[in-house]
Amino acid sequence: MKHNLLSEMIDRGVNVSAAMLINNPRAHTGYRIGLDNSSFSPGTIRYVAPEIRAVILKKLNLDEGENICCVSGESIAVEAAIAAHRGNVVAVEYKAGDRQTMEENVVRFGLNNVQIVDDMESYSHRWPVPDVAFLVASDKLDLELKTLVHVNPKIRVVIYTLEFSIMSRIPGMLWENGIEPTEIMQLEVSKVGRKDEIEVQPAPWIFSGQAGRE
């Protein structure tokens, strides 16, 4: 058996029947929820703290075969695609720069179950029907919820927000769209900084809801 670097063998012709075993000692051998932000592609996106992302993924409660729609939730979309590796992720990114960064992350993590789109107002019948959705709340939230419930009347939703003005309106929007709020929580993460001082991270509100409950 001959041992050599793949880069030294890739362009060589093979004249006889042969088999090649490729060993990558740096390959990831397992997945741990809540990847460090340094794992993701830099760019226009400001990623949520890994600890908060881990809680969000727990609240999404993904099965490996489920489909998920992520609205402006880039790192959530990446980890959801890894967790639900037999399902599909529709990543809605309204900004061109964010779509570019998302595409870089898809390549970086070798994902083949992510579809990146720039709009969800008219959810295409060609896109996978989502079992669950994660949304970063914005002024488009009510329209997004209406679209998701239309596509799947029994969809589960998890909503993230740092904005008080939007946070106070979310319960009403959920009920108006036939989604029963099941849990509301606020998360806070503090870390020790370089000067041995406690640095408080942004403390988002997380809303969970279920549509179509009898």
Language model segments and positions:
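Conserved SAM-binding loop of SAM-dependent methyltransferases across substrates and taxa
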Residues: 74-87
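C-terminal substrate-binding/active-site "lid" region of AdoMet-derived donor-dependent transferases
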Residues: 149-205
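S-adenosyl-L-methionine
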Residues: 92-132, 139-142
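Core SAM-dependent methyltransferase catalytic element
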Residues: 8-12, 18-25, 193-214
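The conserved SAM/SAH-binding core of class I Rossmann-like methyltransferase domains
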Residues: 71, 90-93, 160
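A contiguous loop/helix-start segment that scaffolds small-molecule binding in enzyme catalytic cores
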Residues: 1-43
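Conserved alpha-helix/loop element of class I SAM-dependent methyltransferases that forms part
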Residues: 47-64
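Conserved class I S-adenosyl-L-methionine
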Residues: 65-74
